[in-house]
């Protein structure tokens, strides 16, 4: 029997007299060396002064297995979070690369829907607020009008499951043209016809498909529940060191400051998973990324003034 006494936000000191607009800052789980146990992952993120970790459920068998965690395993993670007064705020559900909702294979689609429902249950048990969805109709299969139509149809089922479990779902602005901009995601949401599908833009991805990042964020402001902060290059969407890419950080942060100043922001980066890496070294890497992030805010706000 699962017994939960977890307070997902007990690391946050809330003041109802404060009117300061300040967002929570999280870090992607994959930024932390995969060799570390959850106890160490939480400690690393906390020591680097982050507010939460975004849980990864990707297409690998190892991470898909998390959807079948026992109540004992879930309680163990709860206990670690409680002990360190930390939380998981969101889930990056990228498993639909492998099990796309737009597939022409009905078995694959059913697997994708099952994965999503299991993700909703896990999110409920872990106190996760947001499930970020990869807005691919297909990834490894050829895209055409049929895969797009299948995606629209099956996303209606996903939206209904999210309502059933009272979980917030949001499209990530993706690394493919299909959903590479906020405008395109809004168009998909309109076609799906479900108001509970929201947006979780990725600044790096958006920068490669739009020259109007500020305007895109302004347009999507009523739907936005969070942001991924990462650097990118044309045709390279992962593992671009901060400051070496072409992500339009200044425009994005100015828009966030003006239109959605309190939504959570997550620094997305990837550990090299060096077997010899220490917790101290991993903390230092996260702190370095956070410093770059803060510098970008300083630059953006200086020019606002």
Swiss-Prot record:
The alphabetized list of GO BP terms reads: L-ascorbic acid catabolic process
Q: Name its pathway.
A: Cofactor degradation; L-ascorbate degradation; D-xylulose 5-phosphate from L-ascorbate: step 3/4
Documented EC number(s): 5.1.3.22
For this UniProt record, give its keywords in alphabetical order, as a comma-separated list.
Isomerase
According to UniProt, the reaction catalysed is: L-ribulose 5-phosphate = L-xylulose 5-phosphate
Q: Which Pfam families match?
A: AP_endonuc_2
The record's annotation in InterPro entries points to: L-Ru-5P_3-Epase, Sugar_Epim/Isomerase, Xyl_isomerase-like_sf, Xyl_isomerase-like_TIM-brl
Q: Name one GO molecular function term.
A: L-ribulose-5-phosphate 3-epimerase activity
Membrane-crossing segments per the record: none
Function summary: Catalyzes the isomerization of L-xylulose-5-phosphate to L-ribulose-5-phosphate. Is involved in the anaerobic L-ascorbate utilization.
Family named by the database record: Belongs to the L-ribulose-5-phosphate 3-epimerase family.
Q: What is this protein called?
A: Probable L-ribulose-5-phosphate 3-epimerase UlaE
Q: What is the organism of origin for this protein?
A: Mycoplasma pneumoniae (strain ATCC 29342 / M129 / Subtype 1) (Mycoplasmoides pneumoniae)
